[in-house]
Amino acid sequence: EVGLWVGLPAAIAGFIGVTMGGRIADALRRRHVSGRIAVILFGAIAPALFIVAAFTASSAGLFFLFNVLTIASGSSALGAAAATTQDLVLPRMRGTATAIFFVGTTLLGLAIGPYMAGRISSLSGSLATGILSLLVTAPVGALVALLAWRLLPAAEARKAAWAE
């Protein structure tokens, strides 16, 4: 029964987060060359707040609510990150760029993250501590996104010059 309360809302939240994040990222990109980075920054910071709220919640209902918000806000960055990657390379390099992007996200996010959470959980005796320990990556992600915001316009200009 818990799987239904966690899994189904998580799938719906992920769908909504990716879809809305992509639409917002594209709208922001039309206004500013680094516009999509704002969505990536949101996707790095907002989930951290909701994860803390979820794992310190006083009831299962609040945990489920904050878990949905964590997934929706975190997944909002995926489309923006993939689209930014595509924008930065010439068309002939998009397959390679996508492969590298997915290797990075798969190895870092889907392999190392759960391993580290499990390892820290085993050492501390607390699953919540294991999961909350992963929040150390949020400031790093935010700093990298801010750096990307600053450097992206020059990278876009270089790509345009290469295409000529």
Positions of predicted regions on the chain:
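A membrane-interface helix-boundary motif in multi-pass transporters
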Residues: 35-38, 118-138
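Conserved glycine-rich helix-kink/hinge and helix-boundary motifs of the Major Facilitator Superfamily
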Residues: 3-4, 41, 95, 99-100, ...
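Small-residue-rich packing faces within the transmembrane alpha-helices of Major Facilitator Superfamily
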Residues: 45-49, 135-142
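Intrinsic disorder in cytosolic terminal tails and internal cytosolic loops
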Residues: 30, 149-164
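Loop-to-transmembrane helix entry
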Residues: 1-13, 129-132
